[in-house]
Amino acid sequence: MIRCLRLKVEGALEQIFTMAGLNIRDLLRDILIRWRDENYLGMVEGAGMFIEEIHPEGFSLYVHLDVRAVCLLEAIVQHLTNAIICSLAVEFDHATGGERVHLIDLHFEVLDNLLE
């Protein structure tokens, strides 16, 4: 069953990463690829993403997940959210020599499948 997730990223957060020499869009893509390849609980049959520009407020990351069991969707979304927050925090820490970035507001919203 395909589910669509949306993650809104504020323009200010993107600028902070850019000032640190990082491209948050590329980081999110790489994190999603690694996460998909791990195949959490064997419940993700496929995953894809695209970015929608929202000028000047930032962008939205849409992730389409093909999940085997909808009852585990909440756990799968939480695992993906944790993977993104932890990975972005580590990348930012390494790029800035120990600086911290506020990522607690990053969370996915589950939408109806936008492909149907």
Swiss-Prot record:
Transmembrane segments: none annotated. GO terms for biological process: symbiont-mediated suppression of host innate immune response. Changing residue 82 to A: Complete loss of virus replication. Induction: Synthesized early during infection. The keyword Zinc-finger does not apply. Belongs to the adenoviridae E4 ORF3 family. This is Early 4 ORF3 protein. It comes from Human adenovirus C serotype 2. The lineage of its organism: Viruses, Varidnaviria, Bamfordvirae, Preplasmiviricota, Tectiliviricetes.
